[in-house]
Amino acid sequence: AAGQVFATLLLADKSGVALDPSAQDDRFPALNDLEPSSPDQAAMTLGTALFVPSTSNDQRLEPTHRSVAEYLAADWLGKQIDSRGLPLQRVLNLMLGFDGKAVPGLRGLYGWLALKSLKAQHGLIKNDPLTVALYSDPQPMDVEAKKLLLQEIYTQTAANPSVLWDLRGAENLTPLFQAELRNEYLKALLDPKRDDSTQTYVVFILK
Protein backbone atom coordinates (compact mmCIF):
# COMPACT_ATOMS: atom_id res chain seq x y z
CA ALA A 1 0.00 0.00 0.00
CA ALA A 2 2.81 2.43 0.84
CA GLY A 3 4.49 1.81 -2.50
CA GLN A 4 1.35 2.66 -4.44
CA VAL A 5 0.77 5.85 -2.42
CA PHE A 6 4.37 6.96 -2.94
CA ALA A 7 4.30 6.09 -6.65
CA THR A 8 1.15 8.14 -7.16
CA LEU A 9 2.52 11.12 -5.23
CA LEU A 10 5.83 11.09 -7.10
CA LEU A 11 4.41 10.61 -10.58
CA ALA A 12 1.73 13.25 -10.00
CA ASP A 13 4.31 15.64 -8.50
CA LYS A 14 2.43 15.99 -5.21
CA SER A 15 4.01 16.82 -1.86
CA GLY A 16 1.89 14.62 0.38
CA VAL A 17 -1.59 13.74 1.62
CA ALA A 18 -4.18 15.91 3.38
CA LEU A 19 -5.92 14.32 6.37
CA ASP A 20 -8.66 16.94 6.57
CA PRO A 21 -10.63 18.64 3.76
CA SER A 22 -9.56 22.04 5.08
CA ALA A 23 -5.92 21.08 4.49
CA GLN A 24 -6.37 20.02 0.88
CA ASP A 25 -4.83 21.95 -1.99
CA ASP A 26 -3.08 21.19 -5.26
CA ARG A 27 0.05 19.93 -3.49
CA PHE A 28 -1.78 17.91 -0.83
CA PRO A 29 -4.73 15.90 -2.20
CA ALA A 30 -6.93 13.68 -0.06
CA LEU A 31 -5.98 10.01 0.11
CA ASN A 32 -9.11 9.02 -1.82
CA ASP A 33 -8.02 11.28 -4.68
CA LEU A 34 -4.99 9.01 -5.11
CA GLU A 35 -7.37 6.08 -5.74
CA PRO A 36 -5.42 3.42 -3.79
CA SER A 37 -6.36 -0.15 -4.63
CA SER A 38 -6.63 -0.96 -0.89
CA PRO A 39 -7.96 2.21 0.80
CA ASP A 40 -7.90 0.74 4.32
CA GLN A 41 -4.29 -0.42 4.02
CA ALA A 42 -3.29 2.90 2.48
CA ALA A 43 -4.91 4.75 5.39
CA MET A 44 -3.00 2.59 7.86
CA THR A 45 0.22 3.41 6.04
CA LEU A 46 -0.30 7.10 6.77
CA GLY A 47 -0.03 6.31 10.48
CA THR A 48 3.40 4.73 10.18
CA ALA A 49 6.87 6.24 10.42
CA LEU A 50 6.92 6.49 6.62
CA PHE A 51 5.04 9.79 6.92
CA VAL A 52 5.52 12.90 9.05
CA PRO A 53 3.33 16.00 9.52
CA SER A 54 4.13 18.87 7.19
CA THR A 55 5.74 21.92 8.79
CA SER A 56 3.06 24.05 7.12
CA ASN A 57 0.05 22.18 8.52
CA ASP A 58 -0.16 19.22 10.88
CA GLN A 59 -3.18 17.95 8.93
CA ARG A 60 -0.89 17.33 5.98
CA LEU A 61 1.50 14.38 5.79
CA GLU A 62 4.70 14.16 3.77
CA PRO A 63 7.06 11.23 3.11
CA THR A 64 9.62 11.07 5.92
CA HIS A 65 12.46 10.39 3.48
CA ARG A 66 12.18 10.99 -0.25
CA SER A 67 14.76 8.28 -0.98
CA VAL A 68 12.67 5.70 0.89
CA ALA A 69 9.56 6.88 -0.96
CA GLU A 70 11.36 6.46 -4.29
CA TYR A 71 12.57 2.97 -3.40
CA LEU A 72 9.16 1.73 -2.24
CA ALA A 73 7.42 3.36 -5.21
CA ALA A 74 9.83 1.66 -7.62
CA ASP A 75 9.32 -1.68 -5.88
CA TRP A 76 5.54 -1.37 -6.31
CA LEU A 77 5.77 -0.20 -9.92
CA GLY A 78 8.21 -2.99 -10.75
CA LYS A 79 5.75 -5.59 -9.53
CA GLN A 80 2.93 -4.00 -11.53
CA ILE A 81 5.04 -4.00 -14.70
CA ASP A 82 6.51 -7.49 -14.28
CA SER A 83 3.49 -9.36 -12.95
CA ARG A 84 0.31 -7.37 -13.42
CA GLY A 85 0.47 -6.04 -16.94
CA LEU A 86 1.12 -2.37 -16.29
CA PRO A 87 2.51 -1.00 -19.58
CA LEU A 88 6.00 0.40 -19.08
CA GLN A 89 5.35 3.13 -21.63
CA ARG A 90 2.49 4.47 -19.52
CA VAL A 91 4.91 4.91 -16.63
CA LEU A 92 7.63 6.41 -18.83
CA ASN A 93 5.21 8.97 -20.24
CA LEU A 94 5.05 10.40 -16.72
CA MET A 95 8.77 10.11 -15.96
CA LEU A 96 10.59 11.33 -19.06
CA GLY A 97 11.25 14.86 -20.25
CA PHE A 98 11.45 16.25 -23.77
CA ASP A 99 14.97 14.87 -24.12
CA GLY A 100 13.74 11.34 -23.45
CA LYS A 101 15.61 11.13 -20.13
CA ALA A 102 14.19 11.03 -16.61
CA VAL A 103 13.11 14.47 -15.40
CA PRO A 104 15.26 15.70 -12.47
CA GLY A 105 12.59 15.14 -9.82
CA LEU A 106 12.07 11.52 -10.84
CA ARG A 107 15.63 10.36 -11.41
CA GLY A 108 15.64 8.48 -8.10
CA LEU A 109 12.44 6.66 -9.00
CA TYR A 110 13.78 5.87 -12.47
CA GLY A 111 17.04 4.51 -11.10
CA TRP A 112 15.36 2.21 -8.58
CA LEU A 113 12.83 1.03 -11.17
CA ALA A 114 15.72 -0.23 -13.30
CA LEU A 115 16.65 -2.45 -10.37
CA LYS A 116 13.15 -3.51 -9.37
CA SER A 117 11.64 -4.35 -12.78
CA LEU A 118 13.45 -7.14 -14.58
CA LYS A 119 11.13 -6.77 -17.55
CA ALA A 120 12.00 -3.09 -17.96
CA GLN A 121 15.60 -3.19 -16.74
CA HIS A 122 17.53 -3.36 -20.00
CA GLY A 123 15.33 -0.79 -21.71
CA LEU A 124 15.70 1.65 -18.82
CA ILE A 125 19.47 1.18 -18.81
CA LYS A 126 19.74 1.79 -22.56
CA ASN A 127 17.59 4.89 -22.35
CA ASP A 128 19.28 6.62 -19.40
CA PRO A 129 22.30 4.69 -18.06
CA LEU A 130 23.72 7.61 -16.09
CA THR A 131 20.57 7.95 -14.02
CA VAL A 132 20.61 4.22 -13.29
CA ALA A 133 24.26 4.36 -12.23
CA LEU A 134 23.91 7.46 -10.07
CA TYR A 135 20.49 6.95 -8.51
CA SER A 136 20.26 3.20 -7.99
CA ASP A 137 22.32 0.38 -6.53
CA PRO A 138 23.75 -1.78 -9.34
CA GLN A 139 25.11 -4.34 -6.87
CA PRO A 140 22.14 -6.79 -7.08
CA MET A 141 22.01 -6.63 -10.90
CA ASP A 142 23.24 -9.63 -12.85
CA VAL A 143 26.42 -9.55 -14.93
CA GLU A 144 24.62 -8.89 -18.21
CA ALA A 145 22.80 -5.87 -16.79
CA LYS A 146 26.02 -4.43 -15.34
CA LYS A 147 27.84 -5.05 -18.62
CA LEU A 148 25.08 -3.28 -20.52
CA LEU A 149 25.21 -0.40 -18.05
CA LEU A 150 28.95 0.06 -18.59
CA GLN A 151 28.60 -0.15 -22.37
CA GLU A 152 25.77 2.37 -22.49
CA ILE A 153 27.63 4.80 -20.24
CA TYR A 154 30.61 4.57 -22.59
CA THR A 155 28.34 5.22 -25.57
CA GLN A 156 26.90 8.32 -23.89
CA THR A 157 30.29 9.71 -22.92
CA ALA A 158 31.49 9.15 -26.49
CA ALA A 159 28.54 11.14 -27.80
CA ASN A 160 28.76 13.84 -25.13
CA PRO A 161 31.87 14.05 -22.92
CA SER A 162 30.24 16.83 -20.87
CA VAL A 163 28.33 14.16 -18.96
CA LEU A 164 31.41 14.10 -16.72
CA TRP A 165 29.68 16.91 -14.85
CA ASP A 166 26.90 14.49 -13.86
CA LEU A 167 29.39 11.78 -12.96
CA ARG A 168 30.96 14.03 -10.35
CA GLY A 169 28.01 13.10 -8.15
CA ALA A 170 29.04 9.45 -8.10
CA GLU A 171 30.73 8.81 -4.78
CA ASN A 172 31.35 5.09 -5.02
CA LEU A 173 30.77 2.86 -8.02
CA THR A 174 32.43 -0.29 -6.71
CA PRO A 175 29.08 -2.17 -6.92
CA LEU A 176 29.56 -2.12 -10.69
CA PHE A 177 32.79 -4.09 -10.47
CA GLN A 178 32.99 -7.85 -10.40
CA ALA A 179 35.42 -10.38 -11.78
CA GLU A 180 33.21 -11.30 -14.75
CA LEU A 181 33.43 -7.71 -15.99
CA ARG A 182 37.22 -7.59 -15.90
CA ASN A 183 37.53 -7.46 -19.68
CA GLU A 184 35.17 -4.50 -19.89
CA TYR A 185 37.42 -2.52 -17.57
CA LEU A 186 40.66 -3.62 -19.22
CA LYS A 187 39.33 -2.64 -22.64
CA ALA A 188 38.82 0.91 -21.43
CA LEU A 189 42.03 1.17 -19.42
CA LEU A 190 44.16 -0.15 -22.29
CA ASP A 191 42.46 1.97 -24.96
CA PRO A 192 45.24 4.07 -26.59
CA LYS A 193 42.85 6.93 -27.38
CA ARG A 194 43.18 10.01 -25.19
CA ASP A 195 40.16 11.97 -26.36
CA ASP A 196 37.76 13.60 -23.91
CA SER A 197 35.13 10.87 -24.09
CA THR A 198 37.58 8.03 -23.45
CA GLN A 199 39.19 9.81 -20.52
CA THR A 200 35.77 10.71 -19.12
CA TYR A 201 34.79 7.05 -19.15
CA VAL A 202 38.08 5.98 -17.52
CA VAL A 203 37.49 8.51 -14.72
CA PHE A 204 34.03 7.01 -14.27
CA ILE A 205 35.15 3.39 -13.96
CA LEU A 206 37.99 4.25 -11.59
CA LYS A 207 35.65 5.81 -9.03
Protein language model features and the residues they cover:
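Extended helical regulatory/linker subdomains that flank P-loop NTPase cores
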Residues: A1-I81
